[in-house]
């Protein structure tokens, strides 16, 4: 049978999602816990998105195959009892063999939280990005609006990105001032490697006056990663939702509704 899970994790504790020889990744820890519940059998998970080291998930979706018959609650409470405190399974659903956590998804959502304050916060360390002064949010919003739609996002793509095409449909890019933070909410059919962090980094340059909103259009048109500002820190980035067709009957389009930092 095939089981889908909704999970959340604090990325500070791990070297990213994808399995590594040293074993300190979210996937490694989850596979081991699931394997124990499955009767000490090997379990391999597949995720909607492969988050980098330091990146968090308020709602990641994974699936795995198993011939172990267990109540769904065992894949939640039982697995959570074996996971470190930085990872939690939120829900479990049995799905058909035609479901794939990555390839069945038609959209993904991310949020980036940025603290703009002269002094960094030790209490929010690793949970938010930080910049030492206030930013021109109006200019950032103007620049963000120019990125909406279907474009070649090569200028905001990591050099090691393995996506077949750099063309993505960015459907939402909102910048919200809330609880003393800036929150960037992004929604697209899919994202390139480092795309969110590269967009946030470029918008920060607009906010501090190093780039104009018109410059963002030039960066987009250049289709050249070397023409854009550096990749911004991973600390404030959260995978917050994955969209699937209704036929799979997964919870609320798998969106995280409880993400608040303050």
UniProtKB/Swiss-Prot annotation:
Keywords assigned: Isomerase, tRNA processing
Reactions performed catalytically: uridine(38/39/40) in tRNA = pseudouridine(38/39/40) in tRNA
Residue numbers binding substrate: 110
EC number: 5.4.99.12
Keyword Isomerase: yes
Gene3D superfamilies: Pseudouridine synthase I, catalytic domain, C-terminal subdomain (3.30.70.660), Pseudouridine synthase I, catalytic domain, N-terminal subdomain (3.30.70.580)
GO biological process, one term: tRNA pseudouridine synthesis
Domain of life: Bacteria
Active site per the UniProt annotation: 52
InterPro entries according to UniProt: PsdUridine_synth_cat_dom_sf, PsdUridine_synth_TruA, PsdUridine_synth_TruA_a/b_dom, PsdUridine_synth_TruA_C, TruA/RsuA/RluB/E/F_N
One Gene Ontology molecular-function label: tRNA pseudouridine(38-40) synthase activity
HAMAP family noted in UniProt: TruA (MF_00171)
Role: Formation of pseudouridine at positions 38, 39 and 40 in the anticodon stem and loop of transfer RNAs.
Subunit structure: Homodimer.
Family per record: Belongs to the tRNA pseudouridine synthase TruA family.
Protein name: tRNA pseudouridine synthase A
Species assigned in the record: Chromobacterium violaceum (strain ATCC 12472 / DSM 30191 / JCM 1249 / CCUG 213 / NBRC 12614 / NCIMB 9131 / NCTC 9757 / MK)
Lineage: Bacteria, Pseudomonadati, Pseudomonadota, Betaproteobacteria, Neisseriales
């Amino acid at each position: 049978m095939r089981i889908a899970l909704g999970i959340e994790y604090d990325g500070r504790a791990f070297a990213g999602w994808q399995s590594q020889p040293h074993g300190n990744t979210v996937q490694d820890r989850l596979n081991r816990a699931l394997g124990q519940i499955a009767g000490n059998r090997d379990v391999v998970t597949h995720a909607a998105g492969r988050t980098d080291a330091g990146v968090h998930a308020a709602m990641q979706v994974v699936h795995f195959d198993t011939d172990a018959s267990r109540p769904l609650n065992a894949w939640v409470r039982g697995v959570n009892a074996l996971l470190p405190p930085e990872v939690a399974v939120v829900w479990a659903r049995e799905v058909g063999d035609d479901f794939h956590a990555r390839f069945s998804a038609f959209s993904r959502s991310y949020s980036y939280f940025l603290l703009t304050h002269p002094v960094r916060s030790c209490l929010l360390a690793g949970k938010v990005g930080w910049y030492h002064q206030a930013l021109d949010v109006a200019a950032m919003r103007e620049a963000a609006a120019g990125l909406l739609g279907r474009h070649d996002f090569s200028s905001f793509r990591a050099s090691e990105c393995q996506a077949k095409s750099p063309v993505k449909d960015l459907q939402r890019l909102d910048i919200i001032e809330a609880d003393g933070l800036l929150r960037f909410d992004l929604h697209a059919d899919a994202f390139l490697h480092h795309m969110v962090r590269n967009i946030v980094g470029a918008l920060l340059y607009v906010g501090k006056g190093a780039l104009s909103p018109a410059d963002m259009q030039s960066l987009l048109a250049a289709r050249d990663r070397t023409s854009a500002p550096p990749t911004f820190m991973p600390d404030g980035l959260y995978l917050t939702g994955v969209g699937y067709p209704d036929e799979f009957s997964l919870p609320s389009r798998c969106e995280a509704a409880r993400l608040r930092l303050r």
